[in-house]
């Protein structure tokens, strides 16, 4: 089977609620996209709202409050919104990387694999049925002499020592207490809605299907980059994909061999090429799914304009499925910076998108300036 990149982009946009825009709930978006990155809360709100024909900026907060969504460390060690019932397989595959077992992790964190095991057991007991701020949790932990040496690292806002606990399903974010984050045990927070933590071999096909359902066609390497920044065992990855057999179809996309779900193959083949403009927020999953190193979606010479210092991913302009520029709001004006080799952008289409960004941002109007 063959497909063009513009067909692939159009199909992905349909699957990701970008074209056409309908009215999905926040949990619909989060489920389809295999999570929404959520280090910057306002950006997560925007990226969900931009996928709604009538943007509902409060949908994320509302669905977190009613426990339809959870916030936890997941893919690539970053904070994500996930559906509680679907989180287990993603977390299982992250735990499977065993990043805390590597000497480099021990050197960087000062915490040994055995101490991570002890922390996991202790935190599971402490958080069962309660919600604690970071300070409250750490204070309880360091009352045990085993954890005294970890106090500074445990109080760190980066949470590197706590991430393996999230992947093992014993810790997630609870409701904020003022400006303080809290943690709790997923099983006690979500009850029957908390899905089980399957073994990696059981989790893998679930996650692969979900990923390809939003970001296919994709290679094994692209999947691993999205999941774990290429930290998963390569033989395991090949086995997981190989075991799916006829559920996957190989597609030749202008010379790149990649996989799509067999159930989606005919739909992809019949998809018309992608056209039009979209303004997407920072850290948007349309780009994070294939990754900023995907040279078809984002030309390598422009990657530095999008993937910035300290892991920041800029809001992007997408034309015909490819990233062709960045944008920002400056003094209540939406400023678009096309890449130098980009053809002139259609002003009316950009202004229409800017109006949608304004609605999703809760402002009345955003005049456009293309620089």
UniProtKB/Swiss-Prot annotation:
List the InterPro entries hit by this protein, alphabetically. Answer: AlkZ-like
Q: What induces it?
A: The gene is adjacent to the azinomycin B biosynthetic gene cluster.
The text of the family note is: Belongs to the DNA glycosylase AlkZ-like family.
Q: Does the keyword Membrane apply?
A: no
Cite the domain annotation text: Adopts a unique fold in which three tandem winged helix-turn-helix motifs scaffold a positively charged concave surface perfectly shaped for duplex DNA. The active site contains a QxQ motif and a beta-hairpin essential for base excision activity.
Question: Broadest EC class?
Answer: hydrolase
- Record keywords, A-Z: DNA damage, DNA repair, DNA-binding, Hydrolase
Q: What is the effect of changing residue 221 to A?
A: No effect on base excision activity
Effect of a null allele: Essential, it cannot be deleted.
Q: What does this protein do?
A: DNA glycosylase involved in the repair of interstrand DNA cross-links (ICLs), which are highly toxic DNA lesions that covalently tether the opposing strands of DNA, thereby inhibiting essential cellular processes such as DNA replication and transcription. Acts by unhooking both sides of the ICLs, forming abasic (AP) sites on both strands. AlkZ specifically repairs DNA damage induced by azinomycin B (AZB), a natural product with potent antibiotic and antitumor activities that interacts covalently with duplex DNA and forms ICLs.
Q: Where is this motif: QXQ?
A: 37-39
- Name the chain's protein: Interstrand DNA cross-link repair glycosylase
The protein's Enzyme Commission number: 3.2.2.-
